[in-house]
Amino acid sequence: MMWLLLTTTCLICGTLNAGGFLDLENEVNPEVWMNTSEIIIYNGYPSEEYEVTTEDGYILLVNRIPYGRTHARSTGPRPVVYMQHALFADNAYWLENYANGSLGFLLADAGYDVWMGNSRGNTWSRRHKTLSETDEKFWAFSFDEMAKYDLPGVIDFIVNKTGQEKLYFIGHSLGTTIGFVAFSTMPELAQRIKMNFALGPTISFKYPTGIFTRFFLLPNSIIKAVFGTKGFFLEDKKTKIASTKICNNKILWLICSEFMSLWAGSNKKNMNQSRMDVYMSHAPTGSSVHNILHIKQLYHSDEFRAYDWGNDADNMKHYNQSHPPIYDLTAMKVPTAIWAGGHDVLVTPQDVARILPQIKSLHYFKLLPDWNHFDFVWGLDAPQRMYSEIIALMKAYS
């Protein structure tokens, strides 16, 4: 489990200053200590940063790359892309490889206006108009609220800022979940999406085998007793420093690599070892216990439903019915492209196969047999095997 890795990390880090361990450390990548705006500027791209306030009061940080390094002199509006990250991540992970291998930068260089959101509750979106992050009520959200409030709020902001009525949506993992919920329940929002690109879509969650699923065997009462009812896996500076040391060591980086395999599936040859410290330093960024319980609900119920509040009375209060509503994927009309990984132990090929017949607007599907759950954003061969296809589909559905 995550806490076992972190404990081991801290114990090992206590020895790093002894003997020759320091001689085995690679030079730390400067992006380890940078936020998203700083990473963008460091790579030579224009950076803009905005705060978006949702209808229910959450203040979300959104980053923008308005144009690429090769399009600085061109004028006129560019097609807009919005990117939504996975659980425990932030929007920096669209940019954590070198510029020629990061989807956010490649899209900007291909002529797109790139926007990247941060989900409520992560390090960069942990503010509210009236609530404090110490309030339990602040953390009473799951991907339901991210779909109902965050995504519409951010898209409205982008439309107003750019003057463009339609945009492309790219989601990874839980980012796809947010998109599918929003586009299947809000037709007016769906009409603003030119195409939905789903990378490792987390909808069916019946067959995961990764280490994180062991956590879902615990009763809700135990999870709440251990982790409380507020934030979950929030960013910790001491852990960040420790994990950076481990992942940057020429021998001990294998611990990071092995943990990633347990979490996401094995495909070590496709990960850039020299960037391991960057990957680990930007995660976890946190979410809510409430959100984790909703994902656990998907695992146990095998149904794509809204959050179950645990009793008929509370469900009636939230949904005007005794059971949480099922999200009907067949109602989504947005043209959709899906990529799945054959070695993905979190979103398995079996689970992806189960949802394909429900997506009536599926225009493209590809299974990458050797990919794990992280290859969609960090894979060395992602630019050739997937990113080029995304750009080609965008041009086809312009």
Swiss-Prot record:
It catalyses: a sterol ester + H2O = a sterol + a fatty acid + H(+); a triacylglycerol + H2O = a 1,2-diacylglycerol + a fatty acid + H(+); a triacylglycerol + H2O = a diacylglycerol + a fatty acid + H(+); a cholesterol ester + H2O = cholesterol + a fatty acid + H(+). This is Lipase member N. Residues 1-18 form the signal peptide. The gene is LIPN. It is found in: Secreted. Disulfide bonds join C247-C256. The active site is at S173, D344, H373. GO terms for cellular component: extracellular region; intracellular membrane-bounded organelle. Keywords: Disulfide bond, Glycoprotein, Hydrolase, Ichthyosis, Lipid degradation, Lipid metabolism, Secreted, Signal. Glycans are attached at N272. Its main location: secreted. It is linked to Ichthyosis, congenital, autosomal recessive 8: A form of autosomal recessive congenital ichthyosis, a disorder of keratinization with abnormal differentiation and desquamation of the epidermis, resulting in abnormal skin scaling over the whole body. The main skin phenotypes are lamellar ichthyosis (LI) and non-bullous congenital ichthyosiform erythroderma (NCIE), although phenotypic overlap within the same patient or among patients from the same family can occur. One of its GO terms (biological process) is lipid catabolic process. Belongs to the AB hydrolase superfamily. Lipase family. The keyword Nucleus does not apply. Plays a highly specific role in the last step of keratinocyte differentiation. Contains two distinct domains: the alpha/beta hydrolase fold and the abhydrolase-associated lipase region, also features the consensus sequence of the active site of a genuine lipase. May have an essential function in lipid metabolism of the most differentiated epidermal layers. Residues 79-379 form the AB hydrolase-1 domain. Its EC number is 3.1.1.13, 3.1.1.3. It comes from the Eukaryota. Transmembrane segments: none annotated. Highly expressed in the epidermis in the granular keratinocytes. Also detected in other tissues, although at much lower levels, including lung and spleen. GO terms for molecular function: lipoprotein lipase activity; sterol ester esterase activity. The keyword Flavoprotein does not apply.
